[in-house]
């Protein structure tokens, strides 16, 4: 139903005759929900709602460039599109947390209200164009993340002392202040690092998103929900030159599909998180 509703919002000219495009999308994901109901969902719906005029090939993290620097890959023209999380640019510009979520922020529902009804999308677009020279829209928004999947119990702030933790964004700096030893790495590297003991614990996504990551096999202690990330909107980045070649109708199509996927992503993840809680319990994890 949601796809049909979105189709009604797309100008008729966008899905009728017009230019054709064969674009590449760089991502920060090795797989899982971020890839399937985020990146690939966007590509599939662009194809459907354009009448087949937009063909977007989606690449896993690292295939076209550094998985943590997707905006750079897109800006340099290696890919026309990218799907990333703006918080990865925290070290470059702390302003990014306003659009990627941060510790103690409001929840996803209120973040969506701000983005789509109170000017957040327009502010994000202006910020990224002025600072990075790229076009930016929200693409996907998750519910509260799991705070930790840990190889050892973490029950008090004292237990964070010296904890080798994989994280990113503003929480990395906060975790340092709490005595942890945080590092940032792409999602595809997290499980191997946990397995060989290079890190003690990780945060990544919501409970549902973390199932395919396999953390439950080796990190048996979970803290949920994560106050470090009550919401996490993701980002569609577009090469400015490629964007400039689109008609106004096709630009509207891109915006509409990005909004559709964002809402659908939030609904899907929120629904699946409840079932995921039971999955981790049955897997012998302590929550």
Residue map of PLM features:
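Polar helix-capping/helix-linker motif
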Residues: 117-118
């Amino acid at each position: 139903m949601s796809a049909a509703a979105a189709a009604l919002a797309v100008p008729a000219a966008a899905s009728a005759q017009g230019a054709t495009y064969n674009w590449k999308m760089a991502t920060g994901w090795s797989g899982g929900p971020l890839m399937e109901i985020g990146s690939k969902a966007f590509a599939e719906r662009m194809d459907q709602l354009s009448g087949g005029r937009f063909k977007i090939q989606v690449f896993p993290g690292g295939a076209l460039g550094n998985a943590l620097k997707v905006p750079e890959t897109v800006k340099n023209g290696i890919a026309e599109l990218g799907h990333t999380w703006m918080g990865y640019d925290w070290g470059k510009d702390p302003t990014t947390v306003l659009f990627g979520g941060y510790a103690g922020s409001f929840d996803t529902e209120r973040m969506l209200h701000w983005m789509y009804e109170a000017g957040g999308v327009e502010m994000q677009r202006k910020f990224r164009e002025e600072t990075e020279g790229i076009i930016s829209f929200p693409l996907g928004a998750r519910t509260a993340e799991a705070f930790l999947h840990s190889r050892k119990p973490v029950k008090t702030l004292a237990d964070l002392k010296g904890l080798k933790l994989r994280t990113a964004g503003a929480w990395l700096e906060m975790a340092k202040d709490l005595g942890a030893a945080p590092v940032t790495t792409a999602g595809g590297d997290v499980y191997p690092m946990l397995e060989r003991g290079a890190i003690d614990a990780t945060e990544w996504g919501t409970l549902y998103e973390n199932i395919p990551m396999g953390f439950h096999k080796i990190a048996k202690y979970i803290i949920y929900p994560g106050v470090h990330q009550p919401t996490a909107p993701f980002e569609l980045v577009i090469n400015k030159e490629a964007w400039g070649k689109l008609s106004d109708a096709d630009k509207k199509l891109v915006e509409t599909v990005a909004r559709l996927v964002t809402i659908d992503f939030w609904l899907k993840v929120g629904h699946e998180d409840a079932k995921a809680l039971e999955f981790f319990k049955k897997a012998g994890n302590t929550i």
